[in-house]
Amino acid sequence: MKTVYIDPENYHYHEMTVAGLKRQLPVCRVNDSLYIAGFVIFGDVELTVRSACELCKMVPEHDVLITAEAKGIPLVHEMARQLGENRYILARKAPKLYMKEPISFEVQSITTAKRQALYLVKSDA
């Protein structure tokens, strides 16, 4: 990960090249000393397809792909499609009624700046 020192008062976007595509990412405050470039893939079909293609070249042998709800959904969906896989697992942010005996685990998210629980259906664990 590259560390870039910025003046957030005057620097509102960070240009980044991802999978050969240039994008302007908004600079977002996490706390008083940490700012991140907010990468949101929703709605950017070209970026989703190209990013998935590059990630598929690097993904190790696996049983199933998994992502956390919600920003990873389009990416893992496209990766599964490109890899010819018919299934992937989604870790939900809250237990759902259809989840019989959900399994929960805590993760640290930098975009929400706090710990959060994720939930899997027991049969997916």
Region spans (language model):
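Active-site-facing substrate-recognition patch
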Residues: M1-E61
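A generic local structural motif
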Residues: A52-E54, L75-V76, Q116-K122
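Short glycine-rich phosphate-binding loop at a beta-alpha junction
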Residues: H62-E69
